[in-house]
Amino acid sequence: MMQRNSNNTSITSNISNNSSSHQACASCKHQRKKCNNECILSPYFPARKTKEFQAVHKVFGVSNVQKMVRTVREEDRTKLSDSLTWEALWRQKDPVLGSYGEYRRICEELKLYKSLVHNQPLIGWDNNQRVFNNNSNNKNGLAMTNSSGSGGFSVNNNGVGVNREIVNGGYASRNVQGGWENLKHDQRQQCYAVINNGFKQHYLPL
């Protein structure tokens, strides 16, 4: 009799330990049902993601989310849950446009950055590899100066003629109509275009 009671006690303790070790996910908490290892939404909406699940449930519904998770491959289910969460949260922020509004905003930013790339003047460099900007009045051409006085070149409005003269570099080179020629010295140097978009600078190799 005592042995039977001890066995029942051990079984009860094992059951309680298993139930306490598996915390109910956000989906099962919302539905107020017991969560077990077979819950399909448990790995993707744990208890700490209650806010995210509430948004997903409001937009898509629990049964629809379960169907979508079952229809995709297991390795893609995390991406699916992240996508549903992102769409649902943006639907809460913008009930009219939802995630499409964020997509439009990103497209407008991309157009702005591309226009800055095409319209920003070329940036010069000196022998100390310091990048600087010279805002000239040339409409179609470029202008590059050298702050240290060791050399520089400029381009006319047509973007064709080059006037380059090096004072301290050991030689002088001048080419008016030949285009981009004789612009290499004994040591290789790189020229970068710097795009200032108001937040940070991007250095683009020419």
From Swiss-Prot:
InterPro entries: LOB. This is LOB domain-containing protein 2. Belongs to the LOB domain-containing protein family. Residues 1-20 are annotated as: Disordered. It comes from Arabidopsis thaliana (Mouse-ear cress). The gene is LBD2. Residues 23-123 form the LOB domain. Pfam families: LOB. It comes from the Eukaryota.
